Structures are given as structure tokens and as C-alpha cells.
Amino acid sequence: VVAPPYDVIPDAALPTYEALSPYNVVRLTRPGRDYDGAARTFNDWLDRGILEPDPPSMYVHEVRFDGKRRRDLIAALRLQPYDDRVVLPHERTHRGPKEDRLALLRATNVSLEPLWFVYEGRATGLQQIVEVVSRRNPAVTFNGPEGTEHRLWVISDPALHAAVHAALETQSVLIADGHHRYETALAHADEVGGDPDSASRFTLALLTDLEDPGLEVLPTHRVLKAGVAVTGGEEKQSLDETLEAIRGRVAAGTYRDHRFQVLPLEGELAVVELHRQVIDNILGKRSPEDFLLYTRDPAEAVRWVDDGVGSAAFFLDAPDLHVVLKQAQEGKTLPQKSTYFHPKPPSGMVFFRLDPNRSL
């Protein structure tokens, strides 16, 4: 019944998820333009007991993947404008995806997918709460996308709720995944209204400690469609040698005319400096979004250049999350697709109804 977040499911894969179960979450998160139909489906599942309301609860979520483990907290997070510097964005957004998600929110009044946030948890004591809860038997276990294994624990003890609140009340959080959905949730909350503590002023959130050893961020490589000459780099013999040479450095690999190079960059974050020092100079006033292709597979980037889809590929190492957080705290936004947090939390575990008449 679970599925990846709505924006990482290709249209061609929708029938596959729909065929898994008549109750797969894509029937809610990817209804096409039938937003009212998604609302009817959600209410029908409630009426038939397919979905069961919990008492006020938080949840601990664990995902195992590739021999690693990550633990998260799922809870309602108060929506606050970026200017309050509590919720920190690190990427710009586009209008189109927000219009689609806002229409779905208006129809359903339900937070259907958790937004993913990262927090600095070393001094909060929250991770200790998560560890204690996860020693119990989980309420739910299931297999998720990409071979992931998941466990879910329910926290219904008001004393633990208070402890979690105390641990996080002075913390800022970084949006890991869901910039468009967060801004949509803000717009919806303003439309619906309600007092400051009403459910409509919150969103469903999955929160991960920045120091969790299972928190993984992957690089996204770029292929430039415009004609470009890249010079001055260190020559490399292969893709593997290029990727190894940029690991842990503020540098970018390049591929053009069957030649690999490494470009040293000056600054804190390679993806920022690649755009500022190289790509922006090539494109001038032209929008990068019109001239860039993105992939997490460096070999695919090489194929695109060899096939003439693009003229040059740029390879990046995974960004340092501490630097990403620092730049977000300074109010700086990064280029599009600077981070790819992995594996993304599946949709369909927990839903949160945005009732303006219900106080939290």
C-alpha cells in the first residue's frame, strides 16, 4: 500500500503501483486532476475501516537499506514562514508543482505525505527518546521501494510527547525533501485559517538527526545542452578516476570530447561554486533550467554526451550536510537539485488531517 513520494514516481510506473493494491497510496497522492476523487477515496477508506484513526500520536520510523539503518521521528510540525528562521529552505521552487499540490490539499484537507526535515540533535536528547522507543516491538513492519525494510513504532504517551516537544522547541530544521509541498502547506494554512494551535496550522513531518549514520545524501550530476568549452582542469583517464579525484574536495569532474578532467573550485560547496564559477559564466543570462539535464548516474551523464544529447557533463561529490545547513542558516539558497536525500520516506505510512476546528 506504500509508494515513493509523488514526485519521484514516473507516470509510466503509476499502473504498477495501482496494481499492487486497490488501497495503494498513489490513488491519493497521484490522482491526476481528479482532486475531488482523491478526497472521496480517502473518506471512503476511513468509512470502511481501511484507514484507522489513531489517538494523538507520534511515531518512530526505521528504514534499513544497503546494510545501513536510519531512524526518524514522525510528528506534526507547526508551519512557519521562512522569515521566522525556524524552517530553513535550501532550494528555490517553481510555481507549477505548488499549484498541483495546493489543489490536492484544498480537496482533501489531509497531509498525505510526510515532508522530510533534518535537525541538529546532539544536544536535544531526542535521539535517546527514539532509541528507547525502538527497543519495543514495532507496531508495523513492511517492505518498501528499492528493497528497503521499514518498521514503525507508535508513541501515544503524553509524557513522551512533552519530552519530544521540549527537545525540539528551540531547534531550527532544514527542509531535506519537500520544498514545494512546504510552501503549498503554508499557502493552504493561510486560506483555511484557524487559531494558531489548530491542526490546519501544522503539517506531517518526518525528522532525522543530522548525525544519524544512516542519513545519506547523493550527488546529482549535470549535463549541459549548450555549446561549451571547459579548459584548465586536471586530466583524468576514466570516469572512476574522475569520481575518486573529486571525493571530499570542492571540485567538479567534467567530460567532453571523450576527455575527463577535474576542475578545482574555490569556496565551501562544490555545487554552488560549479554554478557560480563555471555554468553561470557559460550561460550568461540564460536560465540553467532550460539548458541543464540532471542524473544521479554518472555513467548516464557520459552516455548523454557521447550520444549528443548534451555537450558536456559535470560530476559532483555528495555535498557536506553541515555546510548545506550552514548556508541555509545564513539565508542562502543553493542551485536546483543540489541535494538528494536517500532513501526517501515512503508515502502511505501515516496521514494527518488538517481540521481547523481541532487543536493540537
Give the predicted meaning of each segment:
Residues V1-L360:
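Surface-exposed, charge/polar-rich loops and edge strands
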